[in-house]
Each structure stands twice: as structure tokens, then as C-alpha cells.
Amino acid sequence: MKRDIRRSTTAVATLLLTALPMPLLADHATPEEIHVTGEQSTNKLPLEIEPANIPVVDTSALLKRVPGANVNSNGPITGIAQYRGLYGDRVSIHIDHAPTLTGGPNAMDAPLTYTPPLLLKSLKVDRGIAPVSAAQESLGGHMTATLDRGEFGSSDEFEFSGALSSRFNDNSDGSSSALKSTLTNQHHKLSALYSHDEGNETRIDSDDEIGGTQYRRGRYDISYGWQNESSRIEIYTGELDTRDTGTPSLPMDINYIDGDTVGTNVSTTIGEMVLSGHLSYNHVDHLMDNFSQRTAPASLMSYRANNASAHNTAWSLQARWPMANGFLTVGSDGNETVHTATITNPNNAMFEVANFNDAERDTYGIFTEWEGDIGEWHVQTGARINRVKMDSESVGASGMMGMMAMNANMLATAFNNGDLDEDFTYLDLALNLSRPLNETTTLNMGLGRKNRAPSYQERYLWLPLAATGGLADGRNYIGNLDLDEETAHEITLGFDWQNGAAWVTPQVFYRRIDDYIQGVPSTNATANMLSTMMSGQAALMFDNVDAKMYGADMGYGYTLTETLRLEGNLSYVRGKRRDESDDLYRVAPLNNRLALIYEQHAVMLSLESVLYAKQNKVSDFNAEEKTSGYGIINLAGSYRLTRQLTFSGGVENLFDNRYQDHLAGYNRNADSDIAVGDRLTGPGRNIYLAATLHW
């Protein structure tokens, strides 16, 4: 299969998929396909996995197939994206071109939870240094997920099309189903999407289970689009409905997550200028507790429920027009968010803690970017100025007893008298360069300066708790009103090489981060006393430290015959503090994924090896445990019975190996065959079957 290097406008790695992972058949076009594609700056060399029957429930798990990317898993549908060792708020994620909103203080509704795999059209990861136009804060990279709402037709005649998908996973007795339908012509497009995922606890082997890994999620979406020769508009609204879902790495489980979204994307061409923009609103209600889906605390006074809510309004407007053998883009964007969370005890009506009280974080940005050719170089360069405004209402606690009440009141008073209103203003810069060295090799380079202001948890967590955006290290944290923004300076260097049947896309990077925010031992005696009463350990405090990260990743492949090929990706990252002799927390170990793929006519077979090295470079401050290396084998296959009907299936972890994923958290659910405090074990053998019908 021939792979051509072709011109592109951004440095991205793209994962394309629709209702069900299926092969791209060599002789026939099919509406279902999965690609993992690595792009370097301006020249694209694909890393295609065709097919890739990936029976994932959590979209974030797809990132393991992108060079440099991975996932921090806190539950069956609570994966937090990681890219080159950074994760959480440092990695920007957009859904349908709009910034995402995480409603809970522990990221139980992580951004990619809102895009079930069976409804996903594409997941795009900017490789290396993200353009300044891509996102407001992209210190750790940028990703864009797009739901599959269909395409406009080619005539005035209306056409009705769609897909019905169903999948069964043996390991958790899980099932996933999805319905996509579109009524369209060349000017109008009406789309409706529905999906449902449900499963029981994950089995490790024939005898053991991981307690608290059950899940149930529904997703609904309706959209309307209109276009003519020069303009396009799409309006959409959707809902996420998650119920009774476990998060064994966290102190509570999900009772429900009700997420509502509405938005619009517009573009129009005026002469040589293209104007585009988006407007979106999201609202999330989220209830979690520590007693309904795991062993309840021995004391009725230790029951806890946390009712969180959040909303955001986001917008962008940009103009793009030809200039100096390229294109100039100028734009502005904003994202205003508010978070509230209240902790209660169902056995004590007097107990109430204002975990967060209208914690505001508003980001406003302006940017300019030019992309074009200078001699043999293709250049993309830009600058962005962001202003982040943060504030919070007063907090407090009631219903506590004795010393605990006194300490909590002291912390609340100190917080309320602190400087809650804070502004951060900073400059981001990005430069990506690319040029061909010869017919087979393209050189890619990048330079960047990126910033990130503190999250609302990092500033406004006034009581020592584990509400940390999903860190899942088992420690209590306290916020810090004196935090500075993080500033990263990064350089990347790589090349794309293709010679006949072989291809490879290596890239190395070095990132120096000043004022990196992480937990350090708290010097607040009141917070430490209260944390020790609650957990037996003193608190960690968010603080600025200095860090560095470096590593390499690549995709590679080799075509053996017309029907047989090898494809894989390799990733390595190292994270260290520069001011102390310590390593950074929860960094993915060296890993490699290699697949042998047979594909002919309507048949596909795949044999995949997944290898992870041991991780002994761990964080002392987080008391992070080392993990051993492991390897598993996966099998996959599919058969297209007709042009409309495809069957697929496979076996994950064929030999039922027992292993620990270093990016999984530590178990906090006593209803499990894994001891409390031990790192969660990876899933055992999983047999899955699936079918998709198109019309």
C-alpha cells in the first residue's frame, strides 16, 4: 500500500474513526475506518492502522495508538489524556471546535468522556508544538474530538443515511450500541446521534474482579447544518447522561453526571478572506459519594456526598487571508467558567462544606499566525496574548466537631481574607518549520513558549482534600493563592522518512518548565493537622517548582507484501524536577505497539504486540510506587459480508497476563480483589464481537 507525503497546514497526529472500528478495505470504499496518522508540521506521513478493531468504551484509550500519547485511567470511562508526560488541564481538548468543560473537581467527567467512541468521527492530536490559533492554553499539547454528524450531499435531492452498531465485551459483560442518522442534501444537513454503554466490573482473571469498575452512560445529540457556495453554519445540542459508574482510583464514585451542551460553528468567505468562529455553552450537574457503590465507611459520620455543578461560555472569531506567499490569521477567543461543589453527609443535616464556591476562571486571548513558504522552508509561526482572571466567593464549613471544626474554620477564615481575585497575563509563541532534504526525507523543527495559569483547584482548594483534578495519588492537597503561571520553553526536532515499503517518523523533544505546579509538603500546620485527622498523612500543597521533560516518539511501518504489513509506534518520555532530585508524577514508561496486519478484499486479520517497560523513575513527593514491565498480545479480525453489513471481533490480552498499568491509580474501593492502596491491575482476557449495519 503506497503512502504519499502530502502538504498539510498543521503539525498533527490524527485518529479517524466512526461508528465501529473497521478495516479500510483495499478494493472497496467503506464508510467505517480507523486511521492513526502522524503529521509533521507541514508534511504528512501516515501511520495507518487499517484495520484496528479497538473495543474501547473510553475514547481516551485510543490515544495509546498515537506516538507520544497515553491515558491516566481512574475508572472505566474516566480517562485523562496524557501527551509527552503532561496531562489534565495542561493538555487542551476541544470537542467540535469548542473548549471542553469538566464539571467535577476530580475530573470524573474528563473531556473525552463526552465523546463515546461509537459516535466519534475523528480525534486529532497536534504533534509537537501546537499552533497558537489551536487553543488558548496548550502547554501540554492540543487535541480535537469531532462527533460524526454526517456530510452534506452533492445535489438538491435529500438522502437519508446512517449506521447502527452493536458490540459485546466478554470481560465486563459490557455492551455498547449506537445509532447515527442523517438527512442531507447539498444545502441542508439534519443529524441525530444516540449511544449507550453499560458494563459490570472488570475481571482480572477467572477468579478476581476490580471492584468499582461498573459503568453506564448515554449520549444524545441533534444538529442542523446549512451551507451555500461561500458560507456554512452548524447548530448542535447534546446531552451526556452517566449513572452509577465507579472510579476506584478516587475517593468517591459517580452517582450521576448530567451534561448539557449547545453550540454553533460558522464560516463565510468574503473575497479572499475567510471568517470563522464558534459559540458554545455547557452546563454540568454532578453528584458523587463514598458509600453507595463501595463499602460504606464504618462510621455514619464519615459518609460523604459531593454535589458539583459548573458552566462555561466559550467563543472565538478569526479571519484568514493571503499574505506574502502564505496566509495570515488574526483572531480572538474567550472562555468563562464557574465551578461550585458542596460536600454533605446524608446522616447529618448540619454537615456542609463549601468545597468550591463560584470559583471563576475566565480566559481571554488574541492571536496572530502566519503560514506559508520561504524558499524551500514551509513556516508556521504565531503569537498569542492571554489574560486569565480568577476569583472565588467566600467558603466555610459547618457540622464538624472539636479540633476538626476549629481547624476548618481557621483555614476558611484565612482563605476568605486572602487575595482571591487574581489576574495572569502572558505571551505564547510558536514556530514550526519543515523542508524536504531529498525525495525520501523531510526535516521538521519546532520552537515554542507556552504558558498556563493555575487551575481553580490549584488556587482555591482551601480544605485539605483529594479534589485535585484526578491526580489519584491518595494524598490530600491544599491550594495556594500565591501561585504563578507555568512557563514552558520547548524545542522539537524530527524527520519523516519513506523509501519504498518502509517509513518512519521519529521526533525528539526537550521541554523546560519554569514554575511547574505540583504538590510539595505543606508548611501550613493547620492544614497538616486536619489532613492527618482525616487520612493519617500531612497535606501536600500546590506550589511552583522547576521541571524539565524530554523524550522521543515515532510511528513506523513496513509493507511486506500486497496483503501483509507491519505498523507500530514507540514512545519515551522522562520528567524530572530541576530544583530537587526527584522525578515527576505519573509519567508513562517506555512503550511500543506493533501490529502485523493481513488485509485482502473483505477480510482483515491483525496480530498485535503491546510492550511496556518498567517505570522506576517515580515521584518521591507523591510516594509513587514503581511498576514492572509487561507485554500482552491482542488479536482482531473483521469480515464485510455485504457493502452494508460488517462483522468483527477479537481477543485482548490473549494469554490473560496479569499486569499493572503505571498510569492507573491506586485502589480505594474495598469491594475489590485488589487490596486498598495497591495499584490497579490491568484487565484480563477480553473477547469481543461487533456488527455494524449501514444504509
Regions found by a protein language model. Name each.
Residues G199-E201, D205-D207, G211-R217, S230-L275, ...:
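Flexible loop and strand-edge segments within Gram-negative outer membrane beta-barrel domains
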Residues D241, D285, V338-N345, K389-T413, ...:
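Surface-exposed extracellular loop regions of Gram-negative outer-membrane beta-barrel proteins
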Residues P99-G128:
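Short acidic/polar hinge/loop motifs at secondary-structure boundaries
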Residues V57-L62, G79-Q82, H94, A110-T115, ...:
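N-terminal periplasmic accessory domains that precede
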